[in-house]
């Protein structure tokens, strides 16, 4: 881990784990046979992530350990499972859906027989993470203008999958600051996140938009649904759900503020 991976609450930021998963996934492909190395070089796209955060991790010079395996293989996609450990403690469970992509023709393709055969050597089906319920974003929702930075773009020429989590986070912080507030003594933890990638995001000067609404309000928790979109064309680039838990029970004022952006109240 890096010092820059820490957030304002003194532990590894939830979005940093997505970067760790990517590093492990790339290392897996590059350390395999030339066939899987070429799979990475010719193009692979992430289509979804699921992350379950089990333990906050503080900064340490002890490295985190990521166990990785292939947990499903289809005709034109495969999924990778992960467990991230802090010492002996399981900190994060995750799953990534991946599809092969032909960068030359700019289109999806099927896995070849050699690719399937080599991926199957790492096949170890595990108990899946239950998907968080998907809800459509209501017309009345929190809006956050999103500026893509030049450094957000990866070697494939579009915004890297990790950055989407940063974008969802920036919008979430804006909404939370407007509702429950970020008091020094308050601790809010992301415990679960699902994200689907629908279209690549390109660099441009004009802002995109992240829309966020509250789908569930509990005693100490709330769930947010979000979309990254183009406000001009209404094109949707990604959808996400995030579960946030606090150490204290939500106050009446906080619940009322969250309800202002609630899906159920519309």
What are the residue ranges of the model-derived segments?
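Preference for bulky hydrophobic residues occupying beta-strand positions
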Residues: 1, 51, 68, 82, ...
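HotDog/MaoC-like acyl-thioester-processing domains
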Residues: 53-65, 69-136, 202-204, 214-266
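Hot-dog-fold acyl-thioester-processing enzymes
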Residues: 1-48, 93, 99-192, 247-266
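Sequence-level detector for tyrosine residue identity
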Residues: 17-20, 53, 59, 82-85, ...
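Short structured motifs
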Residues: 47-54, 65-66, 192-198, 209-211
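Short histidine-centered beta-strand/loop micro-motifs
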Residues: 9-11, 55-56, 60-62, 155-158, ...
């Amino acid at each position: 881990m890096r010092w820059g991976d820490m957030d304002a609450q003194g532990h590894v930021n939830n979005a940093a784990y997505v970067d760790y998963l990517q590093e492990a996934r790339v290392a897996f492909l590059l350390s395999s046979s030339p066939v899987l190395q070429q799979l990475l070089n010719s193009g692979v796209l992430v289509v979804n992530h699921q992350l379950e955060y089990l333990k906050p991790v503080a900064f340490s010079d002890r490295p985190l350990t990521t166990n990785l395996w292939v947990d499903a293989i289809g005709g034109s996609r495969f999924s990778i499972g992960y467990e991230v450990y802090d010492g002996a403690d399981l900190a994060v469970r995750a799953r990534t859906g991946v599809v092969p992509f032909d960068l030359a023709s700019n289109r999806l393709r099927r896995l070849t027989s050699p690719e399937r055969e080599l991926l199957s050597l790492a096949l170890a089906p595990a108990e899946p993470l239950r998907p968080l319920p998907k809800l459509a974003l209501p017309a009345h929702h929190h809006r956050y203008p999103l500026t893509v930075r030049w450094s957000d773009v990866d070697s494939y020429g579009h915004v890297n999958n990790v950055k989407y989590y940063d974008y969802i986070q920036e919008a979430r912080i804006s909404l939370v600051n407007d509702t429950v507030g970020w008091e020094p003594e308050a601790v809010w933890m992301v415990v679960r996140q699902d994200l689907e990638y629908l279209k690549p995001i390109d660099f441009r000067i004009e802002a995109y938009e992240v829309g966020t609404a509250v789908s569930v309000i509990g005693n100490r928790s709330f769930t947010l649904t979000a979309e990254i979109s183009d406000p001009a064309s209404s094109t949707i680039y990604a959808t996400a759900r995030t579960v946030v838990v606090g150490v204290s029970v939500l106050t009446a004022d906080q619940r009322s503020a969250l309800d202002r952006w609630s899906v159920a109240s519309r």
